[in-house]
Amino acid sequence: MEFASAMEDVVLIETQEQWERLLDELGTLPCLAIDTESNGFFAYHERICLIQISTEATDYILDPLAVVDLGGLNRVFADPGIEKVFHAAANDISGLKRDFSFEFASVFDTAVACKMIGHRRLGLAHILEDHFGVELNKKWQRCDWGRRPLSDEQLRYARLDTHYLLPLRRQLLAELEAQDLLAQACEAFAGVCQVPAQEPRFLGNGINRIHGAGQLNRAARAVLRTLCRHRDQMARQRDRAPFRILGNETLLRLAERQPRDLDELYKIKGLPKTFRKGAQAKRILSLIRQGRSDPDPASASPAEPAADDHPPSSQPLE
């Protein structure tokens, strides 16, 4: 708690000039804490919207939507002489590679270390509570980090994701050494550095990530595939997460009940108003007829890949 009491104001980096000055400093340090915030719960084309960087002295929040050239950060991430401390690094590294083509060396993943040591609760909120008595406000966990301006509350939340990682790393390093696990941990950390960049993709026949799809008959599965393709197309055009166009539970109900007219369609629970009338409603009915009349046996395998690369939600935004 002594570390927390010394917390200074977070420094928001919003200009190229600010960033260049900070970059010069980062290149001289032996260890940094890193985290990112993205907008994957809101946008189809997910992108990193914040990069949090903590040193032993200061918490920085870098706005990649405002700072044009972040190329210099690759020198830091790829430098084996600068250790980068993440919690559950794979997702952050994958996104940073996707958006900026960064390379990584010398990573310490506190989530991997905690798992090796034997911690049962691996989420950062639980780890910080266990080690520092700190409670994270989960209100901002899934907010739209692509919206500007950022509130003071958002900045406070974001900075806590990295503020404690350096002292946490020191504690975990000692535990890894005490249990003779450091060499094994270093191998795992090196593997995390090789995580590939992941692009959002829609595999047209893949519907098995939708809970309950496996219990549908062939015709209903064909309807579900057709609706998924349509949802994906709309999501791409609007740059919205697919589950915010139509929730997975709603898609499943449509595939199960296969309404034949507007009256039956209107009764589908969870269907947004925009799909209950007009052109959108007629399009949904047409897609259901299309799927029902043309089931594809080749794509009815239980081993199908995932249809929806975004988190499911039972309450899509209208």
Regions found by a protein language model. Give the residues of each.
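N-terminal accessory regions of nucleic-acid-interacting proteins
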Residues: M1-L32, T36
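Active-site-adjacent beta-strand anchor residues
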Residues: L12, D63, F86, A158, ...
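Helix N-cap/beta->alpha junction signal
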Residues: T15, A88-A89, G247
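Non-catalytic, usually N-terminal nucleic-acid engagement modules in DNA/RNA processing proteins
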Residues: A33, F42, L50-I53
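Single-stranded nucleic-acid-binding OB-fold domains
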Residues: S38-H45
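Active-site-proximal helix-loop-helix substrate-binding element of RNase H-like nuclease domains
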Residues: Q52, A57-L166, R170-L173, C193-A197
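Accessory DNA-binding and partner-docking regions appended to nucleic-acid-acting proteins
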Residues: D152, L172-E318
